[in-house]
């Protein structure tokens, strides 16, 4: 029998292990869906603005519903909630696959289905995050957060490259069929788990429960600032991913090159996740978080310079791969450190709402893409990303200088 310890310690718990393996299927489906939707839409419209609209459709419903999704996750059985969300996303992606296969799909089909999936994600993400501590012991939280991050990051590393090959040898409808299978796999995993997770929240209306979670974050400086920084990390630091089809055109890349460029972000994130285990217990955890966030911005600047100056060259492509790799590694390190601090400090009865609010930050990548897409119409695609990176730098500098509660965070007391 395999014994798990250290960074893999959380895998010794059977329910977490099952949840983790199921997450590979559903998260892989999510990554493939994002890639295929963007490629299909750009193929139909050749418009960066439409990519921005797709980003808005993929983020705004999640932002609107996550607060209520967190309240629901605190009130009912989280496993049953995940059963429902997984099944609904399975149906939506199956519908999109049929539309695409029949060649009757339109840009607005893509936008509407992306918005519907985003709406459901507003309920799925809080449950997915809040259920995790129930599957492990507290002392394995660092391991569980890192392993969960590896699911997302390895999917970003592997799936786009495979997706690019799928687009070369088949079509986008094949990608949507695989996405359907991925979400259905997670549905089957949750169905197989004999686990009861009743809600713990107090009585009250949904709005009152949401307000309770918001008040907690507002009055706890550590939670408030780390949540703001997480939103900025995704909205400013990852906005470029939404515009990758446009950057691929700038670099004269085909489908496989597009896939490998996105995969570089996944490789970087996995590298950051593997490195973070050596720093989680650092007495300078707060300073380390700020430093990794700041350093990621300078690699974003490098990416924008290469796509502005060299453009159609193998050298530009190689340097861009290196820049997005490093930026993703550093941003991943920050996000894992921030989420672990929150997971360990949040009261159990507020977990769904507080982590749901934090989880809204993951929708800010596409929303940042909307802002970048709009800015690109006035400057350039590269210039738009540089502007967002500068906003991120300014925020990090302000927090580093103004808030000692973050600078002085220690992993030894978390």
Per-region residue spans from a language model:
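Juxtamembrane transmembrane-helix termini
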Residues: 43, 99-102, 106-109, 195-199, ...
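Substrate-agnostic recognition of the 12-TM MFS/MFS-like secondary transporter fold
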Residues: 18-34, 58-71, 77-92, 109-168, ...
């Amino acid at each position: 029998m395999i014994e798990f310890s250290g960074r893999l310690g959380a895998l010794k718990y059977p329910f977490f292990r099952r949840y983790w393996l199921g997450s590979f299927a559903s998260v892989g489906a999510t990554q493939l869906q994002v890639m295929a939707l963007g490629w299909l839409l750009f193929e139909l419209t050749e418009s960066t603005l439409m990519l921005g609209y797709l980003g808005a459709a993929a983020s705004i419903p999640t932002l609107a519903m996550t607060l209520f999704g967190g309240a629901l996750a605190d009130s009912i059985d989280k496993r049953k909630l995940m059963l429902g969300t997984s099944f609904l996303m399975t149906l939506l992606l199956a519908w999109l696959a049929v539309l695409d296969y029949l060649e009757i799909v339109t840009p607005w089909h893509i936008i509407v289905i992306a918005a519907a999936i985003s709406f459901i994600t507003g309920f799925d993400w809080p449950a997915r995050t809040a259920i995790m501590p129930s599957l492990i012991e507290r002392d394995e939280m660092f391991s569980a957060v890192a392993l969960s991050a590896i699911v997302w990051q390895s999917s970003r590393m592997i799936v786009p490259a495979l997706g690019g090959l799928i687009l070369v040898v088949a079509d986008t409808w094949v990608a949507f069929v695989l996405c359907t299978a991925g979400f259905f796999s997670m549905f089957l995993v949750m169905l197989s788990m004999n686990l009861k997770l009743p809600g713990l929240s107090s009585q009250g209306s949904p709005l009152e429960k949401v307000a309770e979670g918001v008040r907690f974050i507002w009055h706890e400086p550590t939670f408030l600032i780390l949540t703001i920084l997480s939103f900025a990390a995704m909205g400013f630091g990852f906005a470029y991913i939404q515009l990758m089809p446009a950057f691929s055109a700038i670099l004269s890349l085909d489908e496989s090159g597009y896939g490998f460029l996105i995969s570089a972000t996944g490789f970087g994130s996995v590298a950051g996740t593997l490195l973070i285990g050596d720093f989680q217990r650092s007495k300078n955890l707060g300073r380390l978080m700020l430093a990794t966030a700041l350093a990621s911005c300078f690699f974003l600047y490098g990416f924008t310079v290469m796509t502005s100056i060299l453009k159609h060259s193998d050298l530009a492509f190689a340097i861009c791969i290196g820049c997005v790799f490093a930026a993703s590694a550093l941003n991943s390190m920050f996000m894992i450190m921030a989420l672990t601090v929150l997971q360990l400090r949040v009261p159990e009865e507020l977990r769904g709402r507080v982590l749901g609010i934090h989880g809204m930050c993951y929708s800010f990548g596409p929303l940042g893409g909307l802002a970048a897409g709009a800015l690109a119409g006035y400057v350039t695609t590269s210039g738009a990303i540089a502007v967002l990176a500068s906003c991120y730098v300014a925020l990090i500098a302000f927090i580093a200088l103004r808030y000692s509660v973050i600078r002085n965070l220690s992993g030894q007391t978390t």
